[in-house]
């Protein structure tokens, strides 16, 4: 779900920069891979990766990729509507709503994604692999699974007040 309007100011955060090498006949070719998360702190977030000979160019490519890969995050006040578990590769992420004022209880890559999405109160736990790219992908996958109460009610064919 790509958003075309660039009128909204997006904040970007570099999650990881890796030095990668390719072994060729003449020796090693060095490049940099960057993982960047962008968001408007208002329910929209995306991530991207970029690779280049220089770090700034890799970051620029990653930001462009992230802007093309934005998702909408449903929120209830300052937190998420319900608990969600997701995994990508060996990384597993558990995201739980928290009471207002609790803050973001999340580590590293998960923190970057949820803060830039605009979630102010959340508890999370990363299990399994701690590879930043897989943690970010698992977190975004979890945020994609979130549904508002109205959506759940319409899927079940009941009113929102009947959900308990």
Curated annotation (Swiss-Prot):
Query: Residue limits of the S5 DRBM domain?
Result: 10-73
User: Which Gene3D superfamilies has this protein been placed in?
Assistant: 3.30.160.20, 3.30.230.10
Q: Name one GO biological process term.
A: translation
Residues annotated as coiled-coil are: none
Q: Which NCBIfam families match?
A: rpsE_bact
- Entry comment, domain topic: The N-terminal domain interacts with the head of the 30S subunit; the C-terminal domain interacts with the body and contacts protein S4. The interaction surface between S4 and S5 is involved in control of translational fidelity.
What is the official name of this protein in its record? Small ribosomal subunit protein uS5
Q: Which species is the source of this protein? A: Streptococcus mutans serotype c (strain ATCC 700610 / UA159)
Q: Which gene encodes it?
A: rpsE
